């Protein structure tokens, strides 16, 4: 076992949970799977330490509804499902927020499902989902990240009701270590024109295990939050 991997027992000790809970976190995508050795599940140490850092931030994690309200506001869109009072409260809170806190509070924005698939799935799937993270290379604001490497997998959001049809259509196989990440959400209204809100793209990048991608996402969130503070002056 290399230093970039750890057992579920080691991860559980760091997180203060049970190995079974760590396995569930890996299954849901909150922790990345490194590989399996027989029946032993090895998780990515970097993703465990990232989760440890997130848990240091105070505040109860937002519901999907609130998370998408905040991410839409930060992206310059109007969350029509939120009341005027809710939007005002969120704006005031965002103006006092750091990127790390935003990432922590919006952790429930979707449920992550990982799969493996063939080359056809990797090539065509982005046309059926709202791409995000390193897969959002065609977003009109992508150049702001200054990232040049091509994505190796697929990352994107889908309505919860469309997950099963997509899995069947592309013959995807559930795999905790798979390079296809489908994030199911119940807030389709947040995806104007079928696009992921820009702030969500940045948040997803901050959670990347690639240092350059994570830094690019963090820097963009810093800029977006600063712009919101500027509007208050």
Report residues per predicted region.
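Polyanion-binding surface elements
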Residues: 1-25
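A generic structural signal for beta-strand entry/edge sites
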Residues: 3-5, 38-42, 153
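Short acidic, hydrophobic short linear motifs in intrinsically disordered regions
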Residues: 4-9, 80-91
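Short helix-start
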Residues: 28, 32-55
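A short, Lys/Arg-enriched interface patch at domain edges and termini
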Residues: 47-83
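Phosphate-handling catalytic interfaces
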Residues: 92-233
């Amino acid at each position: 076992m290399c230093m970039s991997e750890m057992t579920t027992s080691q991860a559980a000790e760091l997180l203060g949970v049970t190995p079974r809970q760590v396995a569930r976190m890996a299954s849901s995508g909150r922790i990345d799977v490194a590989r399996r050795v027989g029946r032993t599940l090895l998780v990515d140490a970097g993703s465990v330490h990232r989760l440890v850092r997130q848990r240091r931030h105070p505040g109860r994690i937002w519901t999907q509804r609130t998370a998408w309200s905040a991410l839409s506001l930060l992206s310059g869109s109007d969350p029509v499902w939120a009341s005027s009072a809710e939007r005002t409260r969120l704006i005031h809170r965002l103006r006092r927020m750091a990127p790390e806190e935003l990432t922590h509070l919006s952790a429930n924005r979707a449920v992550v499902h990982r799969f493996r698939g063939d080359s056809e799935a990797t090539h065509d799937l982005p046309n059926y989902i709202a791409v995000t993270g390193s897969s959002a290379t065609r977003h009109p604001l992508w150049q702001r990240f200054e990232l040049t490497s091509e994505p190796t997998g697929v990352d994107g959001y889908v309505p919860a009701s469309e997950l099963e049809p997509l899995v069947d259509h592309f013959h995807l196989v559930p795999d905790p270590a798979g390079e296809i990440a489908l994030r199911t959400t119940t807030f389709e209204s947040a995806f104007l024109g079928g696009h992921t809100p820009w702030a969500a793209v940045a948040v997803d990048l901050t959670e990347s295990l690639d240092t350059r991608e994570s830094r690019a996402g963090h820097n963009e969130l810093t800029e977006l939050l600063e712009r919101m503070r500027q509007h208050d002056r």
